[in-house]
From Swiss-Prot:
Family affiliation: Belongs to the LolB family.
GO biological process: lipoprotein localization to outer membrane; protein transport
This protein's record includes keyword Calcium: no
Organism name: Actinobacillus pleuropneumoniae serotype 5b (strain L20)
This protein's encoding gene: lolB
GO annotation, cellular component aspect: cell outer membrane
Signal sequence coordinates: 1-18
One Pfam family named in its UniProt record: LolB
Name of this protein: Outer-membrane lipoprotein LolB
Places the protein is found: Cell outer membrane
Residues with lipidation of kind S-diacylglycerol cysteine: C19
Length: 210
C-alpha cells in the first residue's frame, strides 16, 4: 500500500502540473430534440463501422473534477485487444508519467519513479485509484462512441451516440457526447463527459489513428 500511495501522490503532481484547457470545455448537454430509434438503418450502419475498428489509438487531454480537486493531463490510449491495452498520462511541463497496462494477468499501474501496483480484479484496482468503480475494460468502446447492444442509450439525428448510462457494482456512470470529429468516417467523439455523482471526467480526443 505504501508504493500505491506513492503512485497516487505522483499522479496528483502530474495532473496539477498539466495543461488546464480541457477543464474549461462545456459539460452541459441537452437531450436531442429528435431521438433516433436503435433499429434505424443508418445508425446500425454506423455501429458496424465502429465495430470494425478493433485496434486503434487516441490522444488528447483528460480532466477530473470533484468537490475536492480539479486536475488535467495529456493521455495516450493504445488499444489492441480486450486483453492488451494501455493508457499513459503525462504532462508537457514535467517528466512524470502514470501508466495503466492490461494483459492476460490483469491490470498494472506504474509511474515514472518505478512504483507499481497490479491486480487481476481491474474494477477493484480502479476503485482504489479514483474512489468509485470504473470499468476500464469498457473504456475502449466508450471512447469510440459504441454503446452496449442492449444498453440504455440515446442516438441524435446525426446518427451519433448522444448519451448513455452504465451500472457497475452499485455505481452509475452517465456519459454525454458533446462534440464529434465530423470530418472523417465514421464520425468519432471529440469531447466526452463522464459523470458519477459528484465526480466528472472530461475527455477531449485530439488525434485518432486506426
Amino acid at each position: 500500500m505504501k508504493k500505491f500511495t506513492k503512485i497516487l501522490s505522483l499522479s496528483t503532481l502530474l495532473f496539477l502540473a498539466g495543461c488546464q484547457s480541457v477543464l474549461n470545455e462545456p459539460t452541459e448537454v441537452q437531450q436531442p430534440g429528435v431521438q433516433i430509434p436503435h433499429n434505424d438503418a443508418q445508425w446500425q450502419q454506423h455501429l458496424q463501422q465502429l465495430a470494425k475498428i478493433q485496434s486503434y489509438s487516441a490522444k488528447g487531454q483528460i480532466g477530473y473534477i470533484s468537490p475536492e480537486e480539479r486536475f488535467s493531463s495529456h493521455f495516450d490510449w493504445q488499444y489492441r485487444t480486450p486483453a492488451n491495452f494501455g493508457l499513459e498520462l503525462s504532462s508537457n511541463l514535467s517528466s512524470k508519467s502514470l501508466k495503466l497496462h492490461r494483459n492476460v494477468r490483469g491490470l498494472t499501474i506504474s509511474d515514472s519513479e518505478g512504483n507499481s501496483r497490479s491486480d487481476r480484479d481491474m474494477d477493484s484496482l480502479m476503485k482504489e485509484i479514483i474512489g468509485v468503480a470504473f470499468p476500464i475494460d469498457q473504456f475502449a468502446y466508450w471512447l469510440k462512441g459504441q454503446p452496449e447492444q442492449d444498453g440504455n442509450y440515446i442516438v441524435n439525428d446525426k446518427r451519433q451516440l448522444s448519451q448513455f448510462s452504465y451500472h457497475i457494482n452499485g455505481e452509475v456512470w452517465k456519459a454525454s457526447y458533446v462534440q464529434y470529429h465530423e470530418d472523417r468516417q465514421p464520425n468519432l467523439p471529440k469531447l466526452i463527459v463522464l459523470e458519477n455523482g459528484s465526480q466528472t471526467l472530461k475527455i477531449r480526443v485530439d488525434q485518432w489513428a486506426f
